[in-house]
Amino acid sequence: CQPVGSTIAHEVGHSFQYQTYCDNPTSGCGWRYGFGENEEGGNCFWEQCAQWQAYQIYHEERFNNYNFDEYLLSCYKHPLHEAPRYANYFIQDYWCMKHGIEFIGKLWREARRPEDPIEAYQRITGVNQETFNDEMFDAARRFVNWDIDGIKEYGRNYVGRKQCKLIASKDGYYAIDPAECPENYGYNVIVLNVPSAGVKVSADFVGMAGADGYRKKNVDKAGWRYGFVAYLENGSCVYSDIFSEKEGEAIFECPNFCRKLYFVVSGAPTQHWRHAWDDNDMNDEQWP
């Protein structure tokens, strides 16, 4: 028979999600609840994983579907944000690269109410918040050029990013525009000019949590990860160290045959809290 399309594949994915709970109704798995106060709100992880499952069959649609454009426009948001819930389907690929293709099913089966997917991930894999922040930054920098096992071949024509919105200041610094400021685990990609091979490039980073003009929430838990990504002429990538100081200098030696160069910054809170589906961005954190 002819393929039925990714929409039907998405809905079949929901059937498996329901079945996860039905097979283990007393275990607390399956995410049959929201992540707001008293388990209020919807659950965007259902939509994200159904999309991801559909694209295991319709591979090219990861990148040629309109949801991909939505992802590029919203990657600064929390990965469990309700607005781009149909577009946040790449973190699953990163987790499968680290833990195997079976991991997403394991995550659904072994989650325990009232955990969100991040809490379940940390418990199941045994990582703490600091390590999780490192992993989310590693995912972000790999997403710039789709350097992820299993999707590289489909993303090779979509490498790189457009410049994020920056505001120049009189003291020589650039600040992210509030409209694109990273939330927890969201990220910005700053496009840089490519210097000659062997030249050391540096970025003087200053975290500004609580600054006027940005949303202020749990400012005492502010954190960041940042570093450089080089895309080479042969399609491979070279990554800098991961930097995390609130105020610090990141240094990277430009490799040979560098074609594109980026500076990536991600929100990395020192403590995790759940993101509620409330259709209200004004109570979401920002890490300028």
Give short role names for the model-derived ranges.
Residues 1-62, 66:
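Zinc-dependent metallopeptidase catalytic helix centered on the HExxH motif
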Residues 10, 14, 59, 78-81, ...:
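Histidine (H) residue identity feature
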Residues 39-41, 82-83, 215-220:
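Short consensus segments that form the blades of beta-propeller domains
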Residues 114-288:
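Beta/coil-rich, acidic/histidine-enriched accessory regions frequently appended to metallopeptidases
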